[in-house]
């Protein structure tokens, strides 16, 4: 569907009946359109993000204006200076934006630190020195007025958080507050905390695993797994708490079931603000469920 939508948007006439036929037609007619569609598909399949909320928890869907080419270029220049200072090369940063399902995916391509790799040919070893390219992603949701960032280091995440705040709203600290997820409702409300009403095609949520840390000086951690944590607790001969009291719930994993999908989608939350989604998971429905 994304390939066909990209072809229609670009004014291409295609009639391929399979994914392969459609991709081949687009490649022959407009390789760049196919490349951009492929990039979008990679973006929506990213699974691990850190989330930051805006200063005002308001719906910005109507007021938000996407960044123009000049602002994207200015952002790339500012990022490039940071990358040069941190051994990632100069003149490598590029910023592109893709509008996908009401959100704006910013892909940041830049150089990484130098790599040395051994190459062997005809029983001779040579060393290759090169700077690999790295892709990072920031996703802004106008409806939730929050940004989520996929990057390898804390320094890069802080950099993007400030730059997105500055370029989108003129304030580098606009996204300074980490959007903290709360797992306490699992303790307080039990299975009722898994209510999915009003979350689009999301039909059911099941708690599969949790991690509880005890601050007793012994670094004690309890991890429990089951096909259904709350269901397993109900089935025990001797009733007790599904999740032990007296500790801090620091991580939880869920199976989410969507309408028309047989296989559950995996979701993991690690406090305070890290969210990992399984492949093909509907990120927007999950974010609404967690809001």
What are these regions (language model features)?
Residues 1-291:
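Intrinsically disordered, low-complexity, charge-rich terminal extensions
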């Amino acid at each position: 569907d994304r390939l066909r939508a990209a072809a229609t948007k670009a004014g291409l006439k295609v009639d391929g009946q399979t994914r392969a036929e459609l991709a081949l037609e687009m490649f022959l007619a407009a390789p760049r359109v196919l490349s951009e569609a492929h990039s979008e598909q990679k973006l929506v399949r990213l699974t691990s993000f850190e989330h930051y909320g805006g200063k005002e928890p308001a719906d910005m869907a109507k007021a938000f204006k996407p960044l123009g080419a000049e602002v994207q270029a200015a952002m790339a220049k500012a990022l490039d200076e940071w990358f040069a200072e941190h051994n990632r090369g100069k003149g490598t940063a590029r910023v592109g934006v893709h509008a996908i399902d009401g959100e704006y995916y910013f892909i940041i391509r830049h150089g990484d630190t130098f790599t040395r790799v051994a190459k062997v040919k005809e029983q001779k070893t040579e060393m290759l020195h090169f700077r690999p390219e790295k892709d990072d992603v920031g996703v802004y949701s106008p409806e939730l007025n929050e940004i989520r960032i996929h990057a390898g280091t804390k320094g890069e995440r802080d950099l993007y958080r400030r730059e997105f705040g500055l370029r989108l709203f003129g304030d580098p600290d606009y996204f300074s507050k980490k959007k903290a997820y709360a797992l306490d409702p699992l303790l307080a409300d039990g299975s009722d905390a898994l209510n999915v009403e009003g979350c689009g095609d999301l039909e059911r949520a099941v708690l599969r695993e949790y991690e509880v840390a005890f601050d007793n000086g012994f670094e004690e951690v309890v991890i429990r797994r089951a096909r259904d944590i709350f269901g397993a607790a109900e089935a025990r001969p001797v009733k007790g708490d599904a999740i032990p009291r007296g500790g801090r719930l620091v991580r939880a994993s869920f199976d989410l079931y969507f309408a028309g999908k047989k296989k559950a989608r995996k979701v993991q939350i690690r406090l305070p603000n890290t969210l990992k989604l399984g492949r093909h998971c509907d990120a927007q429905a999950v974010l609404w469920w967690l809001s």
